[in-house]
């Protein structure tokens, strides 16, 4: 699925479904009740937390994650998958993403 410049919350759901549907979990909800999703991949003892779009209008890292995830899931990366568990939150601020603003729905910059 091609990812354009801006990735609103509804498009994020499409990407999550296509990339790794079994590992998705809702970990919370935004001020405006949009789900905040996390993907867990890998089985190793080394844990890595990755998140993006803390600022809703900055989706470049989100798109990079969706390039990274298929690479990590490739069978060539089995050793890495066995050593690491990745917790990926691809859109930390879905309200800001929906509005295309840096702040969340409460006008708070999440930095």
What are these regions (language model features)?
Residues 35-38, 75-76:
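Short, charged beta->alpha transition segments
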Residues 37-45, 53:
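Short beta-strand-to-loop junctions in surface cap/lid or active-site-entrance loops
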Residues 56:
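Short active-site segment of divalent metal-dependent hydrolases/proteases
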Residues 28, 42, 92:
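Residues at the C-termini of beta-strands that transition into short coil/loop
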Residues 20-23, 43-47:
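Short glycine/proline-enriched coil/turn segments at helix->beta-strand junctions
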Residues 1-36:
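Short glycine- and acidic-rich boundary segments immediately preceding or forming the N-terminal edge
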Residues 45-51, 59-111:
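Active-site/substrate-binding loop(s) of hydrolase catalytic cores
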């Amino acid at each position: 699925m091609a990812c354009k410049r801006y990735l609103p919350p509804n498009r994020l759901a499409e990407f999550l479904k296509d990339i790794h549907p079994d590992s998705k979990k809702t970990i919370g909800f935004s001020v405006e009740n949009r789900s905040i999703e996390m993907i867990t991949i890998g089985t190793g003892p080394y844990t890595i937390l990755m998140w993006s779009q803390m600022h809703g209008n900055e989706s470049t890292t989100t798109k990079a994650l969706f390039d990274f995830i298929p690479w990590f899931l490739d069978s060539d990366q089995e050793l890495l998958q066995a050593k690491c568990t990745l917790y990926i939150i691809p859109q930390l601020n879905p309200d800001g993403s929906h509005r295309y603003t840096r702040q969340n729905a409460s006008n708070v910059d999440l930095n």
